From Swiss-Prot:
Additional detail: Available data suggest that activation and inactivation gates are located near the cytoplasmic surface of the membrane. It is hypothesized that residues 802-806, 847-857, 894-910, and 942-955 might, in conjunction with the positively charged residues of S4, act as a voltage sensor involved with the activation gate.
Glycosites: N278, N288, N317, N591, N1160, N1174
Physiological role: Mediates the voltage-dependent sodium ion permeability of excitable membranes. Assuming opened or closed conformations in response to the voltage difference across the membrane, the protein forms a sodium-selective channel through which Na(+) ions may pass in accordance with their electrochemical gradient.
Keywords, alphabetical: Cell membrane, Disulfide bond, Glycoprotein, Ion channel, Ion transport, Membrane, Repeat, Sodium, Sodium channel, Sodium transport, Transmembrane, Transmembrane helix, Transport, Voltage-gated channel
Species, as recorded: Electrophorus electricus
Gene Ontology cellular component list: voltage-gated sodium channel complex
Notes on the domains: The sequence contains 4 internal repeats, each with 5 hydrophobic segments (S1, S2, S3, S5, S6) and one positively charged segment (S4). Segments S4 are probably the voltage-sensors and are characterized by a series of positively charged amino acids at every third position.
Protein name listed in UniProt: Sodium channel protein
IV repeats: 1304-1602
Keyword Ion transport: yes
Intramembrane stretches listed in the entry: 347-371, 735-755, 1200-1221, 1491-1513
Example of a GO biological process term: neuronal action potential
III repeats: 988-1295
Length: 1820
């Protein structure tokens, strides 16, 4: 109901006085004393009047004297409560409690009033804010001065004063709105309290408590209202993460237990020197000491270390584990890697390892160590954890955070809409009141004046009301006071607004404005439009509008004409591109001539852009030039370029050159994709403003926490983490480095710095701090950032790229050039034709014909004349181009009409051919993939429509023509008559070949050969040279496959013809592969197989598996989706490359040639600058020492290598070396110094934020958006259904798949029956679940170094649990009999029990006979499977797993595609990188020597992990990095060098394909299905409700008949749980449901389920057809036609019963009347015979007894009545009385019971159905 607003009056704001308090108290007492019969609905506080919000506009501005003083509450909800408000400056509402503060200070106490004035004063808030910021700055000082203690006391005093002010003004804790009732004040109170505790009480761990001071930074959140909103949203999102957190922790616990069982103790396996050398034995014997084996293996000198490694080399005893070098043996010794923190020895450390693995932080290190220690086969464990944990669970957190924040946004939007609606209602009421006032005023004037005066004054009144220019006019005159209307007002002419500006308000109108709730003036609108004073606008117009004289104006017009021409924009765009190209070709080293060329080019381009700016200023005048954002941007860049030219000789000014790169953003004016994406980023940054501040505060706080807690520890215990006892690069000894560590943790790299922290600062404290950083900063905040960024990618934004019809200048210029080209072509062709005809003496065609042809050809290339805006048409000079859309020359695919625009006939024919190759179903002769034309391919659409119109042609069984018409026209002998002779034989041969290649067996055979040939490629590893027999077999097999594919190709040539074969893309792929194979065989026969070119051709065979793409339906769907996404992906890739180009060129300017260093070749250590200062010193030492002047492999020496560096930084792999080199760099050819250039860290921080975070997430956004758009195009049915219908459809879909399972009958045997009752009780399940949890805890307490006693106890506990679960299984088997195996969970339990028993029995045998422990470990995993039974007890977890199950089919398809990509790249890797030097990430396990090792490496790179280490050896080109002549044992291949071009291309392309595309498709599908699962779980009915219905049905339908007795229906629906439950009394509601009742009074399962579902969801007529179809399906699945036929419905049954009740009542009344009449007759007889007596009306009178018998239901009176009546009837009748002819001598028993049963109609009661049935039968 709309609230009523009266006109605003000053008395609306009333002071809060003692009288006000007495009124509130009196009203409260009155309300308590009043007992109202009907409870009033509970009111709620108004949202717009909450504390902290601004006063709604409708109330206007309160008078100045009422600010900052207590006022009566405006909210009606608080009118009856002891509260008051204070409105501060800015009209902010502050609400206070009216009770005494601290039981002393009343609201009228001067001290409290003073505290309130201070508290609400904005200056106080600014002072506190300044104090907080100052305090934060002081806390960041590493070595505070001596007077810092005084400053600290000052801050403490200020905070104490703030708390005192708040407590005095609000009260402490008793009552609403007191100090401690606000959670934000808890922070203030705790900070101040802890400050005093740490100052005055001597505590040991003072540093930990003093860390509370850091939380003062959080006080900044309390000052800004927007930040409070963000924090509330974050807290709400964390609340909603409950189910995901539980599932994540549960999954991690299960994986942790599995990891413990598989890898416990493995990471301690090290290579120990063995056998023991004679020197050691001699030493022991000389000193007569016994040999200490433990000390020997623990001694690090006896362990094998790789160069530069901190931990000993791991190894394993499995066949596929890492091996030790000669002279070493694998033993368990020493501590675990990484200071002992990386291990699987107990639950806690294993959980940390798995948590790190799930977050993918340096997981390649854990992966490599585990596979080396346990074996390559355990890669399967990591695949499961990565795909289920990392890809699924982490992205579920992203989805939950995004949905939670979206809900907060929706709630905020709803609140704003409610306020707007309330405001509109108030405005409407004010308008009506104002009209009434105006009408009254007119009426009073009309009654006082004459007719003429009346008309005149009335007209004036109208004018005064309508035209209030410059005068205050009421808001009632504005119909819609929204921003839209205000903007419309702003669009009025300048003259009116200027007139209105200088008028003065009258005092009377001002008084009226003060008394109105909300008043607007045109002056306010003009002020909002122009914030500066009018004088400034006059001055600007006079100075910056240059129209001084005629010649200048004439010159300006011509300059305007030139500068606004599209060709000028095209020229400037080309200059921008050329300028970027000039800057990007800068490299190191450069010769002087090249450098001079670049300098000259820079000068030329700077001159051009400066001239452009000057000419545009002349053309537009400065007044208009600087009103356009792009012009301002351009002027800044030009000014900086000119400044850079002037400062070019100064040191450090090269960075200014990089700023010229920003000019590339001007391409956004003509590049729609770039424009849209820049807008998205800008909008996201704007929308994320508050979130950015909160994230910055959190980073600041955690950096301070680390600095305060661990700063000193890093200095004291530095020798623990550094060999030279110098601080490492990552430490917390100062605030800046602490900030870098927190930022690195937010980037996902935290585990390495946490190891150092735990080593110097203690495990518990470091774990707590880091976990908070990861959970709050990484998982919540950054996911929220990503979610809001993705929300900017609405379909409207990205689809607008395609739908944008606006024509820019470059398109117009391009169109002009194309039209000129076409005109020249037509002119030349026409001239030549005319000349030829003239020579031949023929008459040339008329001009009209030529003109028509030219017009027709030019029609497609024309634009309407009004393509330009009005201001672009200068002096009537217009353009003749008339095509609304055309091709953009910068990015192909941007325009909607790629294929239509501006192509000649040959281009069109080529385009048609290409489209035909992908689109025509007949032409897909080498593929079963049907090309799906996208919306951007109109040509493909047209051809698709033609195909649909001509289906008969497509179904033709005859082959097509071999050659095109042009070929036959040029070579007529190709046209063969197929009706006779050789032509007929040729035609029959073609038809036979056509039949063969079209046969399914042929296709199956070819696919089999493709798979076989692909599998053969996997065997061609480095060991093939040692297996001569296999090598010969593979060579012959390769030839056989080649011959098979040649035959296939020849058959298809003959069958399909060249035209059709070579217009199919898949056939082209097949042709290339076969051609490469033919060339390989030919070269081997000729002896040229060792040539490099031939070897490269052989690698093309790796593409053979691509041929299988078209044969698998699942991969076909994924490929089609990928093909549809390629245009969007390419656009975003180009934008990312452009963004990165800026950073790359900036890196070249900053670091080119500066990454060189002089190193010791033995240890690879950088020599100190004291020994080597520059390159010359290093060169001098090279001749005498083992030193080298080397460059970092990945550097910024040119833009290309800069791109590679940025890719490593953006994927956080290999970025440390690059960043270290950057911060150590000095000048070119100078030796680096440790962190001499420390603030270069900021370059990488800025790039990570903008270059990595934004641009890489653009891929996710684009792929998800494209995926959703394609789904909308393909899922047509969903587009035509409403949301309610979708809910119905989902619910009905579940119902359709649901079938009433047979209930397991209770056994007849007594013992089995008792056991059945026990195992089916809910208590049994709860008991077993508790045992499973205890079992899980028992498994968690296992550890590697546990004592024998603990080991025996845990073993016995395991035996006990096995016995318990075995007994449970046996009991269930006994009770449920053969039905036990009909339940899936029972089968799972049975399998777990069997495997557990086998593991228990075999464990001794396995250990006794030293069988491989792998089998034993796998069997022990069965114990963990018991834990999975907990899933069925958790509804939320089942919902999330249901989302995963929904995703499985699509994920399987993507997995197939990913496997195919990995397979192909593995073959390429084996061909090119099998023999590279073992360096970096390449070793004896992780390499490309075999197919298995290649797959292990590529799985690692799939998550972008470790690719920098694998890339490093491929960048070696020659000595001394590698040896090109080294022999590889067992092979003929020489050398171990790589190929940088191949290596960079290989790894970059794989990362883009797998990490950025395929993995993101994986993420997109999971997010999509999570949304579906959440939608279904948030529906009124979900899967659990139907399961509950099913289980309840089985309790009533014990025999599983799928029918329920009608009389049991009320009890059944009452037994259901919410929301399906229909509580008693429910018979009337069941009747209204109108369910069918079949024979024998039964109701079917489906009818009840449909009826209950419809009751919950509501009824819609659209779903009737779906109901009928589901009924038909259910009837088909359960054929019982006779029994299923409905007899009646519940509604009809109720009507019949009600009709019977009506008949019974009428009959009862009839019987009653007869009985009373009969009793009266008998009474008369009695009185006549015996005479009148007293007490006739007493209780024992006959009528009274009869009435009592009838109405009190006392059947005992029936026999006395009959005994009294019978003797009376035997007496003779009195002749004077008329006896009725017929009357009942004896009331029948049935009737008596009926009357008794249904008597007392005045008492309302619910008749039971059993009674109704008896009545019906008795009457019948």
């Amino acid at each position: 109901m709309a609230r009523k607003f009266s006109s605003a009056r000053p008395e609306m704001f009333r002071r809060f006085t003692p009288d006000s308090l007495e009124e509130i108290e009196a009203f409260t007492e009155l309300k308590k004393s009043c007992t109202l019969e009907k409870k009033e609905p509970e009111s709620t506080p108004r949202i717009d009047l909450e504390a902290g919000k601004p006063l709604p506009m409708i109330y206007g501005d309160p008078p100045e004297d009422l600010l900052n003083i207590p006022l009566e509450d405006l909210d009606p909800f608080y009118k009856t409560q002891k509260t008051f408000i204070v409105i501060s400056k800015g009209n902010i509402i502050n609400r206070f409690n009216a009770e005494r503060a601290l039981y002393i200070f009343s609201p009228f106490n001067p001290i409290r009033r003073g505290a309130i004035r201070v508290f609400v004063n904005s200056a106080f808030n600014f002072f506190i804010m300044f104090t907080i910021f100052s305090n934060c700055i002081f806390m960041t000082i590493s070595n505070p001065p001596a007077w810092s203690k005084i400053v600290e006391y000052t801050f403490t005093g200020i905070y104490t004063f703030e708390v005192i002010v708040k407590v005095l003004s609000r009260g402490f804790c008793i009552g609403h709105f007191t100090f401690l009732r606000d959670p934000w004040n808890w922070l203030d109170f705790s900070v101040v309290t802890m400050t005093y505790i740490t100052e005055f009480i001597d505590l040991r761990n003072v540093s930990a408590l003093r860390t509370f001071r850091v939380l003062r930074a959080l006080k900044t959140i309390t000052i800004f209202p927007g930040l409070k909103t963000i924090v509330r949203a974050l807290i709400e999102s964390m609340k909603q993460m409950g189910d995901v957190v539980i599932l994540t922790v549960f999954s991690l616990a299960v994986f942790t237990l599995a990891g413990m069982q598989l890898f416990m103790g493995n990471l301690r396996h090290k290579c120990i020197r063995w056998p023991i050398s004679n020197v050691t034995l001699d030493y022991e014997s000389a000193y007569n000491t016994t040999f200490d084996f433990t000390a020997y293996i623990e001694n690090e000198e006896n362990q094998y270390f790789l160069d530069g490694a901190l931990d000993a080399l791991l190894c394993g005893n499995n066949s596929d584990a890492g091996k030790c070098p000669e002279g070493y043996t694998c033993m368990k010794a020493g501590r675990n890697p990484n200071y002992g923190y990386t291990n699987y020895d107990n639950f806690a450390w294993t959980f940390l390892c798995l948590f790190r693995l799930m977050l993918q932080d340096y997981w390649e290190n854990l992966y490599q160590m585990t596979l080396r220690a346990a074996g390559k086969s355990y890669m399967v464990f990591f695949i499961m954890v990565i795909f289920l944990g990392s890809f699924y669970l982490i992205n579920l957190i992203l989805a939950v955070v995004a949905m939670a924040y979206e809900e907060q946004n929706q709630a905020t939007l709803a609140e704003a809409q409610e306020k707007e609606a309330e405001f509109q209602r108030a405005v409407e009421q004010l308008r009506i009141q104002q009209e009434q006032i105006n009408d009254e005023r007119k009426a009073s004037l009309a009654s006082q004046l004459t007719q003429n005066q009346e008309a005149e004054i009335t007209d004036d009144g109208d004018d005064a009301i309508k035209e209030c220019n410059g005068k205050a006019f009421p808001l009632a005159n504005i119909r819609e006071p929204s921003s839209v209307k205000l903007s419309t007002e702003e669009q009025r002419s300048d003259s009116k607004s200027m007139d209105s500006k200088h008028s003065v308000d009258k005092p009377s109108l001002k008084h009226k404005a003060a008394s109105t709730m909300s008043v607007f003036t045109l002056e306010d609108l003009e002020a909002a439009r122009r914030p500066c004073p009018p004088v400034w606008y006059k001055f600007a117009g006079f100075v910056f509008k240059w129209n001084c004289c005629g010649p200048w104006v004439f010159l300006k017009k011509w300059v305007h004409f030139v500068m606004m021409d599209p060709f000028t924009d095209l020229f400037i765009t080309l200059c921008i591109i050329l300028n970027t190209l000039f800057m990007s070709i800068e490299h190191h080293p450069m010769n002087e001539s090249f450098q001079s060329l670049l300098s000259a080019g820079n000068l030329v381009f700077t001159t051009i852009f400066a001239a452009e700016m000057v000419l545009k200023i002349i053309a537009l005048d400065p007044y208009y030039y600087f009103q356009q954002t792009w012009n301002i941007f351009d002027s800044i860049i030009v000014s900086l370029s000119l400044l850079e030219l002037g400062l070019s000789n100064m040191q450090g000014m090269s960075v200014l050159r990089s700023l010229r790169l920003l000019r590339i953003f001007k391409l956004a004016k003509s590049w729609p994709t770039l424009n849209i994406l820049i807008k998205i980023i800008c909008n996201s940054v704007g929308a994320l403003g508050n979130l950015t501040i909160v994230l910055a505060i959190i980073v600041f706080i955690f950096a301070l926490v680390g600095f305060q807690l661990f700063g000193k520890n890093y200095k004291e215990y530095v020798c623990k983490i550094s060999d030279d006892c110098e601080l490492p690069r990552w430490h917390m000894n100062d605030f800046f480095h602490s900030f870098l560590i927190v930022f690195r943790a937010l980037c996902g790299e935290w585990i390495e710095t946490m190891w150092d922290c735990m080593e110097v600062g203690g495990v518990p404290m470091c774990l707590a701090v880091y976990m908070m950083v990861i959970i709050i900063g990484n998982l919540v905040m950054l996911n929220l950032f990503l979610a809001l960024l993705l929300s900017s990618f609405s379909s409207d934004n990205l689809s607008s790229i395609e739908e944008d019809d606006e024509v820019n200048s470059l398109q117009v210029a391009s169109e002009r050039i194309s039209r000129a080209k076409n005109w020249v072509k037509i002119f030349i062709t026409g001239t030549v034709q005319a000349l030829v005809l003239w020579i031949q003496g023929k008459k040339p065609p008329s001009d009209d014909v030529v003109g028509e042809e030219g017009d027709n050809e030019g029609k497609k290339d024309t634009l309407p004349l009004n393509y330009l805006d009005g201001e672009k048409i200068v002096d009537g000079i217009t353009n003749c181009v008339e095509s609304p859309t055309l091709n953009l020359p910068i990015v192909k695919g941007e325009s909607e009409i790629e294929e239509e625009g501006l192509v000649d006939s040959s281009d069109e024919e080529d385009t048609n051919k290409k489209k035909h190759a992908l689109n025509d179903e007949d032409s897909s002769v080498c593929s079963t993939v049907d090309y799906s034309p996208s919306e951007q391919d109109p040509l493909a659409k047209e051809e698709e429509e033609e195909e649909e119109e001509e289906p008969e042609e497509l179904e033709s069984k005859d082959p097509e023509a071999c050659f095109t018409e042009k070929c036959i026209w040029r070579f007529p002998f190709l046209d063969v008559d197929i009706t006779q002779g050789k032509g007929k034989i040729w035609w029959n041969l073609r038809r036979t070949c056509y039949t063969i290649v079209e046969h399914d067996y042929f296709e199956t055979f070819i696919i089999f050969m493709i798979l076989l040939s692909s599998g053969v490629l996997a065997f061609e590893d480095i060991y093939i040279w040692r297996r001569r027999v296999i090598k010969v077999i593979l060579e012959y097999a390769d030839k056989v496959f080649t011959y098979v594919f040649i035959v296939e190709m020849l058959l298809k040539w003959v069958a399909y013809g060249f035209k059709r074969y070579f217009t199919d893309a898949w056939c082209w792929l097949d042709f290339v592969i076969v051609g490469a194979s033919i060339m390989g065989i030919t070269s081997s026969l000729l002896g040229y197989e060792e040539l490099g070119a031939i070897k490269n051709l052989r690698t093309i065979r790796a593409l053979r598996p691509l041929r299988a793409l078209s044969r698998f339906e699942g991969m076909k769907v994924v490929v089609r989706a990928l093909l549809g996404a390629i245009p969007s992906i390419m656009n975003v890739l180009l934008v990312c490359l452009m963004f990165w180009l800026i950073f790359s060129i900036m890196g070249v300017n900053l670091f080119a040639g500066k990454f060189y260093r002089c190193i010791n070749t033995t240890t690879d250590e950088i020599l100190p600058v004291e020994e080597v200062n520059n390159r010359s010193d290093c060169m001098a030492l090279m001749y005498t020492n083992e030193v080298r002047w080397v460059n970092l492999k990945v550097n910024y020496d040119n833009a290309g290598m800069g791109y590679l560096s940025l890719l490593q930084v953006s994927t956080f792999k290999g970025w440390m070396d690059i960043m270290y080199a950057a911060v150590d760099s000095r000048e070119v050819e100078d030796q680096p110094i440790y962190e001499i250039n420390v603030y270069m860290y900021l370059y990488f921080v800025i790039f990570i934020v903008f270059g990595a975070f934004f641009t890489l997430n653009l891929f996710i956004g684009v792929i998800i958006d494209n995926f959703n758009r394609q789904k909308q195009k393909l899922g047509g049915e969903d587009l035509f259904m409403t949301e309610e219908q979708k809910k119905y459809y989902n619910a009905m879909k579940k119902l359709g798949s649901k079938k009433a399972a047979k209930c397991i009958p209770r056994p007849s045997n007594v013992v089995q029956g008792v056991v059945y009752d026990i195992v089916t009780q809910p208590f049994t399940d709860i008991f077993i679940m508790a045992l499973i949890c205890i079992n899980m805890v028992a498994m968690m307490v296992e550890s590697e170094d546990q004592s024998q006693v603990k080991k025996d106890i845990l073993s016995q506990i395991n035996v006990i649990f096995v016995i318990i679960f075995t007994v449970e299984c046996l009991l269930k088997l006994l009770a449920l009999r053969q039905y036990f195996f009909t339940v899936g969970w029972n089968v799972f339990d049975f399998a777990v029990v069997v495997i557990s028993i086998i593991g228990l029995l075999l464990s001794d045998i396995i250990e006794k006979y030293f069988v491989s422990p792998t089998l034993f470990r796998v069997i022990r995993l069965a114990r963990i499977a018991r834990v999975l039974r907990l899933i069925r007890a958790a509804k939320g977890i089942r919902t999330l797993l249901f989302a995963l199950m929904m995703s499985l089919p699509a994920l399987f398809n993507i997995g197939l595609l990913l496997f195919l990509i990995m397979f192909i790249f593995s073959i390429f890797g084996m061909s090119n990188f099998a023999y590279v030097k073992k360096q970096g990430g390449v070793d004896d396990i992780f390499n490309f020597e075999t197919f298995g090792n290649s797959m292990i490496c590529l799985f690692e790179i799939t998550t972008s992990a470790g690719w920098d280490g694998l890339l490093l050896p491929t960048l070696n080109t020659g000595p001394p990095d590698c040896d090109p002549d080294v022999e590889n044992p067992g092979t003929d291949v020489r050398g171990n060098c790589g190929n940088p071009g191949k290596g960079i291309t290989f790894f970059c392309s794989y990362i883009i394909l797998s990490f950025l595309v395929v993995v993101n498709m994986y993420i997109a599908i999971i997010l999509e299905n999570f949304g579906v699962a959440q939608e279904e779980s948030s529906d009124l009915l979900c899967e659990d409700d139907f399961v509950m219905f099913d289980e309840t049905w089985h309790k009533f339908d014990v025999h599983g008949t799928q029918f329920l007795d009608y009389n049991d229906l009320p009890r059944f629906v009452n037994a259901l749980q919410e929301p399906m439950r229909i509580p008693n009394p429910n018979r009337h509601k069941l009747a209204k449901m109108d369910m069918y009742v079949v024979m024998e009074d039964k109701i079917s399962y489906l009818d009840v389920l449909l009826a209950v579902t419809q009751e919950v969801l509501g009824d819609t007529t659209e779903m009737e057809a779906m109901r009928l179809s589901i009924q038909a399906k259910f009837k088909k699945d359960n054929p019982s036609p006779t029994f299923f036929e409905p007899v009646v419905t519940t509604l009809r049954r109720k009507e019949e019963e009600w009709a019977s009740v009506v008949i019974q009542r009428a009959f009862r009344q009839y019987l009653l009347m007869r009985a009373v009449s009969h009793a009266s007759f008998l009474s008369q007889i009695k009185h006549m015979n015996e005479g009148p007596k007293d007490g006739v009306g007493s209780q024992d009178s006959l009528i009274t007894q009869k009435m009592n018998a009838l109405y009190r239901g006392n059947p005992e009176l029936t026999m006395p009545l009959e005994q009294q009546i019978k003797p009376m009837l035997d007496k003779p009748r009195m002749p004077s009385l008329s006896v009725p002819e017929t009357y009942p001598i004896q009331i029948p028993k049935e009737v008596t019971n009926e009357v008794i049963l249904h008597s007392a109609p005045m008492v309302r009661q619910n008749y039971s159905y059993s009674g109704a049935i008896v009545v019906r039968e008795s009457i019948v």
